[in-house]
């Protein structure tokens, strides 16, 4: 379902914990991190789509989260042609998204990345609200920045946008094995046999 301009209606989810840290998911078999997101099906409201995507991609249900805020309007990004399937090139331009800020009221162990046959993420972690976005695929960075900025007004304590240092992004990309011994792990993964 595309709008007249070629944008697919979509929802994006910024999930925070009680420390205002943001949930990041690592894309399956990739080295990029992103927030949960997904298309709005015909007849769904953005809120219904958000809850469906949250359960499909993260394994959390409505009782695990509280809606803190949402963007006032659609935020758009265009997808480069080489990422678009040949059969829809010329019609499809990108995504237009309503972004939701959710506070997790459940527990970390409620997260289940294997709710579907084809999971989106193979690892996840909490990270500071403001983090360098170079771990996000380039064409989504601007919309992420705009969503984080707009929704930051809903945070329970003010967070000041301090330009992050480069080592913060490296930490987000580090795997469990590459951590320093005294550094706590915040990455959540499941063993392959589950």
UniProtKB/Swiss-Prot annotation:
Q: Which Gene3D superfamilies match?
A: Nucleoside Triphosphate Pyrophosphohydrolase
Q: Where is the Nudix hydrolase domain?
A: 6-149
What Enzyme Commission number(s) appear in the record? 3.6.1.-
Task: Enumerate composition-biased segments (Basic and acidic residues).
Answer: 179-194
**Which parts of the sequence form the motif Nudix box?**
38-59
State the needed cofactors, names only: a divalent metal cation
This entry carries the following GO cellular component terms, namely: cytoplasm
Keywords for the protein's UniProt record, in alphabetical order: Hydrolase
A GO term for molecular function: mRNA 5'-diphosphatase activity
| GO BP annotations, alphabetical order | mRNA catabolic process
- The domain of life for this entry's organism is Bacteria
Q: Where is this region: Disordered?
A: 158-194
CDD domains named in the record: NUDIX_Ap4A_hydrolase_plant_like
Listed InterPro entries: Nudix_hydrolase (IPR020476), NUDIX_hydrolase-like_dom_sf (IPR015797), NUDIX_hydrolase_CS (IPR020084), NUDIX_hydrolase_dom (IPR000086), RppH (IPR022927)
Tell me one Pfam family matched here.
Answer: NUDIX
Protein's job: Accelerates the degradation of transcripts by removing pyrophosphate from the 5'-end of triphosphorylated RNA, leading to a more labile monophosphorylated state that can stimulate subsequent ribonuclease cleavage.
**Family listed:** Belongs to the Nudix hydrolase family. RppH subfamily.
Give the protein name, as stated in the record.
RNA pyrophosphohydrolase
């Amino acid at each position: 379902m595309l709008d007249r301009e070629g944008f697919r209606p979509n929802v994006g989810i910024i999930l925070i914990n009680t420390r205002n840290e943001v949930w990041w998911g690592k894309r399956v078999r990739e080295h990029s991190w992103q927030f949960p997101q997904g298309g709005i099906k015909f007849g769904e409201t953005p809120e219904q789509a958000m809850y469906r995507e949250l359960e499909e991609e993260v394994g959390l249900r409505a009782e695990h989260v509280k809606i803190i805020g949402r963007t006032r309007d659609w935020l758009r990004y265009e997808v480069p042609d080489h990422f678009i399937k040949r059969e829809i090139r010329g019609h499809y331009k990108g995504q237009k998204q309503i972004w939701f800020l959710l506070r997790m009221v459940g527990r970390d162990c409620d997260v289940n990345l294997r709710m579907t046959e084809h999971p989106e993420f193979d690892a996840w972690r909490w990270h500071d609200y403001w983090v360098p976005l170079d771990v996000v695929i380039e064409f989504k960075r601007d919309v992420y920045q705009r969503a984080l900025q707009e929704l930051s007004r809903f945070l329970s304590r003010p967070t000041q946008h301090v330009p992050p240092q480069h080592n913060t992004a490296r930490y987000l990309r580090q795997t469990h094995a590459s951590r320093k011994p005294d550094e706590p792990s915040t990455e959540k993964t499941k063993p392959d046999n589950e």
